[in-house]
Regions:
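Short beta-strand segments of immunoglobulin-like
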Residues: 41-46
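Extracellular acidic, Ser/Thr/Pro-rich low-complexity tracts
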Residues: 58-62
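Surface-exposed, short loops/turns at beta-strand junctions within beta-sandwich domains
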Residues: 98, 107-112
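Aromatic sugar-binding surface patches on proteins
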Residues: 92-103
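Bacterial Sec signal peptide processing site at the extreme N-terminus
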Residues: 20-34
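Short Trp-Ser/Thr-centered turn/loop motifs at beta-strand boundaries
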Residues: 128-130
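Bacterial N-terminal signal peptides
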Residues: 9-19
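Extracellular Ig-like/FN3 beta-sandwich strand-entry sites
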Residues: 51, 65, 111-115
């Protein structure tokens, strides 16, 4: 009986984690739109209230990077959740650069495992491809 319960619990967790992948794939941006790559959090595991550094590589044809958006999904207190509003990230300090690596400090106060999806937008409103990375807050 215990093995069956453990197997069902494992199956449920796998099913919930697979649900994180139901969003559209991180495809290609529109022609002439910005591209991002290599999304990372350093460190990937942080204590609650501590700061982590999000970094990613970007290429923008018109050198007019405006802002980014983080879509937050995750598991916290044994519940799967998804944020209703994307979290805006100010990237105006990188305006004027055609390519480079952006580094943004982020702070999380609530515990849990987060799957964060990032995309950036230019001043003309062109959106980039989307990238995902995992961050654990303990």
């Amino acid at each position: 009986m215990i093995r069956r319960t453990q197997a069902l619990s494992l199956l449920l967790v796998a099913w919930l984690l697979a649900g994180c992948a139901l969003a559209p794939p991180a495809g290609q941006p529109a022609a002439g739109g910005p591209r991002i790559a290599n999304l990372r959090f350093d460190p990937e595991t942080v204590p609650a209230g501590a700061t982590t550094r999000m970094s990613f590589y970007f290429e923008v044809g018109g050198a007019d990077l405006e802002e980014g958006f983080l879509i937050e999904r995750g598991i916290s207190q044994f519940q799967f959740y998804q944020a209703f509003q994307p979290i805006p990230v100010d990237l105006r300090s990188y305006s004027g650069q055609v390519a480079g690596t952006a580094e943004v400090p982020l702070r999380w106060n609530s515990l849990g495992v987060r799957i964060l999806e990032l995309y950036v937008v230019t001043k003309q409103g062109q959106a980039s491809n989307r990238l995902r990375a995992t961050l654990t807050v303990r």
